[in-house]
Amino acid sequence: LTASTAPRRAAVLLLAVASLFAAFAAGAEAKSAKGTTVKVMSRNLYLGADLTPAIQSTSTESFIEANGGIVRQVEATNFPVRAKGLAKEILGEEPDLVGLQEVALWREAPPSLGPVFSGRPEATKVKYDFLKLLLAQLNKGKALYRPVVVQDEFDFEAPANANGLPGDGPGGTGLLANAEVNGRLTMRDVILARIGAGVVTSNPKNANFSKLLVVKVAGAKEISVTRGWTSVDATVRGSKKFHFVNTHLEAFDNEAEYPSVRAQQAGELVAPGGPAASKLPVILVGDLNSDVKTEVKPGDGQAYRVMTKAGFRERATGKPTGCCIDSSYDLKTGSNKEMNHKVDHIMTDDPKQVKLLESAVTGRAKSNGYWDSDHAGLFSALNILR
């Protein structure tokens, strides 16, 4: 080598090595970032009232009075206003898929004990359709969300002393003397998909659990508290196809029983051939009424343990917690300090393929003078690897 060519060749060699290293680094970075961001949300809307007094009633008279209290509380918690705040939460996060629970449909009819004894609800006059009201707020000015699966759950109708006054029911004397109306509650679970965001859904499915809580109301009548699940296969902006499941497990069972009703329902989800058992990566959202780290009573964690034993792992933040505003009759009072445990979850059975990018808890402050729900919402942005 001459004195003039050696430095040039050394510089060329150094440049080549640097270029090779840069290419390798770029390739490694592309590989690590390979995947698609998918945004999901779980949102319990709160049906609008506490059903416990009716469930615990011991006579027909106390049952009708308790039902009247439920009707009045639904009015007081004002879903038409709460829907505005709920829509703001959802639109603020822009999830591609949303799992909704307690999407109540309230209907009414003249007072009658017939539907109680027959077990066949008959009321058709709509008082509040939570799904319709929420979609109206979400799609105001532009269609942004559509329901892809709707599943009816608990559906029950009974007479109610709606105004709380004695003796003014149209039925005159007797058991219906105080009842002005029949109230019908149809609980629903719903999956929403974002419009115009590259969300493609297929294979919608829905069903009820076979294991249900049975309660005795009015001291005699046994009713089943129907709960279930919804699911859909989806791709988002060209992502790998995945299986999205939304569910709401039992809330009123005895958590100290082993296995509890909610634990058995979780078992149905993850059983071979169950809605959360798929060859595709599964993303499950919902109100499991269960957690291990923030267990309120011994046994509360059973359902969550069933999920983790089946290979499911959390894909959402654990803090702040989101359940529940219990002290407020009308959702106008109370503090987010009451949200001291976790029951709403976002999970996956394929933690190697589904990575958590970011997560947020929504609805921990009042809007429009009301808490949006007794629950907070839960949002996660996930990276689904190809």
Residue map of PLM features:
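Solvent-exposed loop/turn segments at secondary-structure junctions
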Residues: 45-49, 103-107, 152-157, 197-198, ...
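Metal-dependent phosphoester-hydrolase catalytic domains
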Residues: 197-208, 233, 256, 260-263, ...
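A well-ordered secondary-structure block
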Residues: 138-140, 144-242, 246, 354-362
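Surface-exposed intrinsically disordered loops and tails
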Residues: 59-77, 110-125, 157-182, 203-222, ...
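Bacterial N-terminal signal peptides
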Residues: 11-23
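N-terminal, active-site-proximal structural segment of metallo-dependent hydrolase catalytic domains
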Residues: 28-171, 386
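Bacterial N-terminal signal peptides that target proteins for export
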Residues: 1-14
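Active-site beta-strand/loop signature of hydrolases that rely on acidic residues for catalysis
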Residues: 40-45, 82, 86-112, 117, ...
